[in-house]
Amino acid sequence: MTLHRRGLLGLIGAGAAGAGLPAAARSARAVAFQHGVASGDPRADGAVIWTRVTPSDPSARGIRVDWSVWRDGDASAAVAGGTVETGPERDFTVKIPVTGLQPGVEYRYAFTSGETRSPQGRVRTLPVGANPETVLAVVSCQLYPGGLFNAYDAISKLERLDAVVHLGDYIYEYGAEPGDYGMDHGAALNRAPVPAHEIVSLADYRQRHAQYKTDPDLQAAHARAAFICVWDDHEVANDTWTMGAENHTPATEGDFGARKAAALKAYFEWMPIREPEGGLTEEAIYRSFDFGDLASLLMVETRLTARNEQLTYAADMPMTAAGPDLAAFEARRNDPARDLLGDRQRDWIKTTLQASRAAGRPWQVLGNQVVMARVQGPDISKLASRLEIMALMASLKPEIRAQVQQAQQLFSLGVPFNLDSWDGYPAGRERLYAAFAEAGVEPIVLAGDSHAFWVNDLKDAG
């Protein structure tokens, strides 16, 4: 919905009418903007803008929210605006796909409900034509109890920023027990996850998203620029694949499909992202962004669209009297059926890259969740002497020593470090590399998930 001068006059009239409500009625409709504002998925003519209202009355329904977009710092000169209603059916979130804007321009936006006004946000539309420079901040894997979001504070203070690219793990599903992931710092930092248990239901996922968006540094980054996001696994559960997850137990946590549906509903409510169009399923969030004549950014989906279940060394490395059966394991790992993308998404990647190259853009960038490079586990026998290794083992607790010894045996075989990454799907990776070659491009591939900084040259099996 886009309104210009006459529409805005109508909104002013509606606000004047609301001013005549009895004080009790106005109080019942009082709200706060506790989760800030956000924008996302910019286009040349617009972007998504987002907020969430917190009503003082938890049973409230049909909360009216006005929105406006302007440029040059003059909030009274709105170029787009409108009114929407929100309520408990979408957890009081508001998401507006704004259109009718000019390309390559930074706009401001804000929301109003009753007498309460939200913070302002900034969003830059995608440029068209000549574009000498694009500045992107790339982030992933933000664990609320694991530490403070200082990086987002730094991002919010960047003088020039076109967009923030988020590669997934925007939230984590774990609980607040002392042994839960991240809780070695969470209690001391007063950042224990809410709810305190592992999240499974729609109410759980909504509450966890809400907690993350109370972080002031994350709010500041969202207000600074548009986010271009994909999920990874922890938005649902650790090591998600199409039909399940490592961190999902059907016997105690119910049907995985129901859990996934709850997680995705909360994600689309709480994130400034467009829902898939053109008859695609809600899992198919792959999409592209063109930054003028400079670059194309392709965001891909590698979790819920086509991913086969991950292999594990415990289940898929047969043991014989002579030791691990590496040949049998490699036959399973190299099964041509193993994939992360699926044919439809891979064809889309190829045609989108071809179109970018045909348009003369020199840069193509792939926003992808997991490490694409081949990464072998470290063979410590080649890094330290036998005596040094024995001393290391002696210093470890027995349960940790057993794990290290098992890893040492495995990695001496030259096997991959992480089977959840592209290394667990080498045939699918080769098909993607072939698509790059057919498109005639050598893209930059971004990856999250690993909680480490990597720079790799990507090479096919040839």
Model-found features: residue ranges?
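Metal-dependent phosphoester/phosphodiester hydrolase catalytic core
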Residues: 5-11, 15-19, 26-462
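Secretory targeting signals
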Residues: 1-3
